[in-house]
Amino acid sequence: VEVQCNRGVNGIEGSVSAAVGYAAVSDRLNFLLVGDLSFFYDMNALWNGHVRSNLRIVVLNNGGGAIFHALPGLDMAGDTRRFVTASHGASAAGWAESQGFTYLRVTDTVSLLAALDDLLDEAATAPVLLEVFTDAETDAEEQRNYYHAIKEEWKNFLR
C-alpha cells in the first residue's frame, strides 16, 4: 500500500485536486477518503476532463464540517456553530454523475457491503464516488471515544 497525502490549512483545500493528479500518473487504483466539506470545497477538480477510471473517492457526508463539532467552545449562542461547521443538506450525487462517475450511496451497513464490489472493481470503465451518509453528532462522539481509548492504551503501555 502506498499512501500519498495533501494537507493544507485544516486539510480542506486541494485534496480532490491532488487525488485526481495522483490517479493521472498511476495505473493502480487510487483512493481518496475525504469529508463532505473538503469535497465540496474542491469538487471543481472533477470538471477538468482528465479524471481517470482508476480514481475512487469516498465522501463521508455528515452534513458539514463535523470535525469542528469536537472543538471546545462551539456551544456558543446564535449562529456561530452553523457558520463554523458550514452545515448543509447537499449530496455529491448530481455533480459526480454529471462528470461521468459511477455514484454509490451508502446509508447503512447493508448498502456499504453492496457497494464495495463496485468500489473495488479494477476493471471499471469510470471513476467511482461512494458517498457515505453519517450523523455529525454520532461522528463527533465516536471520535472522542476513539481518542480516549488511544490515550488510555498509552497510559497502560507506559506504566
Where are the language model's segments positioned?
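Thiamine diphosphate
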Residues: 1-159
